[in-house]
């Protein structure tokens, strides 16, 4: 039974999964369907967490919009996610950056990783 599930999940994985880490600033292009129209909506922010493996892998991105924190979580291998491009590499020392939710202004920034 386990191999059957694994075969089905492997068929649903994206061939080119985007490469990014927690702390990176990313620009996510997602398909939004409104009625009979379909458009691409861009969401740019800091990756707070990545969790799960395989088809169940998800990532959460946070940005501040008009002084209000907005977080969105997407499945990594979803067909809704058109592309994920890394705008800036961040240096994170934690796997989950949940502490950024309480911070505002410059304190909510992640240091840039120089490679």
Curated annotation (Swiss-Prot):
Keywords: Ribonucleoprotein, Ribosomal protein
Gene designation: rplS
Cysteines joined through disulfide linkages: none
Keyword Ribosomal protein attached: yes
InterPro entries in the record: Ribosomal_bL19, Ribosomal_bL19_sf, Translation_prot_SH3-like_sf
Lineage: Bacteria, Bacillati, Bacillota, Clostridia, Lachnospirales
A Pfam family assignment: Ribosomal_L19
Protein name as catalogued: Large ribosomal subunit protein bL19
Keyword Ribosomal protein: yes
HAMAP family linked: Ribosomal_bL19
